[in-house]
Design a protein with these regions (language model features):
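Intrinsically disordered/low-complexity terminal segments and short unstructured peptides
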Residues: 1-3, 13, 31, 46, ...
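Short aromatic-glycine-(Arg/Gly/Cys) micro-motifs in beta-strand/loop hairpins
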Residues: 1-26
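Short, mixed-charge low-complexity intrinsically disordered segments
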Residues: 41, 45-79
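Intrinsic disorder/low-complexity segments
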Residues: 4, 28, 34-37, 51, ...
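Hydrophobic beta-strand residues in large extracellular and virion-surface proteins
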Residues: 6-12, 30, 36, 40, ...
Length: 79
């Protein structure tokens, strides 16, 4: 599964919360570096659009690529 997919960790820091909101996105692996860069930008833009209604409460978005073993059957390991 990890050979055909990449995983993105999305962290959203809000003004009121001590802990960030964390979730993961899975996407098909790109064959080129330029494609991977475009895919990362797409994930960032989709995240910002999805959370736009809460933008006044959000301080920071962090989207990073993580290895497949960080997300195992819904469990979160340290990335």
């Amino acid at each position: 599964m990890s050979a055909t997919h990449v995983f993105y960790k999305v962290e959203i820091d809000t003004k009121d919360s001590v802990q960030p909101i964390i979730y993961f996105r899975k996407a098909k692996r790109c064959s080129t570096a330029k494609g991977a860069d475009r895919q990362h930008n797409r994930i960032v833009n989709e995240t910002v659009d999805a959370w736009r209604q809460f933008s006044s409460q959000i301080m920071r978005y962090t989207v990073s690529r993580v290895p497949a073993d960080v997300v195992v059957h819904g469990d979160i390991r340290t990335a």
